[in-house]
From Swiss-Prot:
Gene, per the UniProt record: HACD3
CDD domains: p23_hB-ind1_like (cd06465)
Keyword Lipid biosynthesis: yes
Lumenal topological intervals: 171-189, 234-242, 302-325
Record-given protein name: Very-long-chain (3R)-3-hydroxyacyl-CoA dehydratase 3
TM region(s), chain numbering: 150-170, 190-210, 213-233, 243-263, 281-301, 326-346
């Protein structure tokens, strides 16, 4: 009777251009590792789950790979790197849909697709920045200037939103609910300043000064400025409503944790309490802020209908009057889409920061 074929535990991960396999065998001797007809063949003497024996396995890859695997032996395992022929993301490792029992994801090395794309972009940006720095001057000087600029920007924003937060808090304790109705006239100038300055964040992300993705910051910037400049700024009837207080208070609460975190990051400091707050307070505050903004839009619809502001009539032969409230209803949909985009981005940031378990990947 033929001896039973023993297979070792194999863990895999990927990037767009290569595959990583970790074979759990210690004290490996005489390894035979090759790729023929897109099938990886492995056979070696080593100590695995069944003791000191000969272990082997074969894996037919999902897509084409280069036939020259690179492997490295350590005392505890065998690390194999295989280059993909085309740089792309694979939905699984093997051609067969059912995963072999001995194969599992290597969560220590795994990144999901969006993370891998961010890593790829970061590497490309790093190379481009390196070339720019070599041609422009001392890397240390430019890095110091960049950190100084970002530190001052975040400091100014922190002071601005702190002033708004403290002012509104003190007035609430002194005046109670009466403070709700003149919030706009009290803090609007500072909010205008902070929100106009917030455009710099999207510019920084777009030109590569920071590594933040452009889309989430742009969604937040456009959404807030639409509420501030269009809903509140152009309609005096909206400026005396209580919803202004809740919108401004939630915005400022989020920012008095976010900007100090960025300030400390500029000087390579990590205050654990602040870090936890920065990656946690948004969980209740972002939905609350979205709800408050939605209420302000809904309350403004009859006001815009009554005044006819920003409404227009299509030219002949259509001659249909298009009310601005129609666009506000569309905006309500976009508002919750923006919440989803930002929520997803911030959740992934939090997951990476605190090392939560990644989803199971086949």
């Amino acid at each position: 009777m033929e001896n039973q074929v023993l297979t070792p535990h194999v863990y895999w991960a990927q990037r767009h251009h290569e595959l990583y396999l970790r074979v759990e065998l210690s004290d490996v001797q005489n390894p035979a590792i090759s790729i023929t007809e897109n099938v990886l063949h492995f056979k070696a003497q080593g100590h695995g789950a069944k003791g000191d024996n000969v272990y082997e396995f074969h894996l037919e890859f999902l897509d084409l790979v280069k036939p020259e695997p690179v492997y490295k032996l350590t005392q505890r395992q065998v690390n194999i790197t295989v280059q993909k022929k085309e740089s792309q993301w694979w939905e699984r490792l093997t051609k067969q849909e059912k995963r072999p029992l001995f194969l599992a994801p290597d969560f220590d090395r795994w990144l999901d697709e969006s993370d891998a794309e961010m890593e790829l972009r970061a590497k490309e940006e790093e190379q481009l920045n390196k070339l720019r720095l070599e041609s422009q001057g001392s890397p240390e000087t430019l890095t110091s200037l960049k950190k100084g600029y970002l530190f001052m920007y975040n400091l100014v924003q922190f002071l601005g939103f702190s002033w708004i937060f403290v002012n509104m808090t003190v007035r609430f304790f002194i005046l109670g609910k009466e403070s709700f109705y003149d919030t706009f006239h009290t803090v609007a100038d500072m909010m205008y300043f902070c929100q106009m300055l917030a455009a710099v964040e999207s510019i920084n992300a777009a030109i590569g000064v920071t590594k933040s993705p452009v889309v989430p910051s742009l969604f937040q910037l456009l959404g807030r400025n639409f509420i501030l400049f269009i809903i509140f700024g152009t309609m005096e009837e909206m400026q005396n409503k209580a919803v202004v207080f809740f919108v401004f208070y939630i915005w400022s609460t989020v920012e008095i944790f976010r900007y100090p975190f960025y300030m400390l990051s500029c000087i390579d400091m990590d205050w654990k309490v602040l870090t936890w707050l920065r990656y946690t307070v948004w969980i209740p505050l972002y939905p609350m802020g979205c709800l408050a903004e939605a209420v302000s839009v809904i309350q403004s619809i009859p006001v815009f209908n009554e005044t006819g502001r920003f409404s227009f009539t299509l030219p002949y032969p259509v001659k249909i009057k298009v009310r601005f409230s129609f666009f506000l209803q569309i905006y309500l949909i976009l508002l919750f889409l923006g919440l989803y985009v930002n929520f997803r981005y911030l959740y992934k940031q939090r997951r990476r920061r605190f090392g939560q378990k990644k989803k199971k990947i086949h």
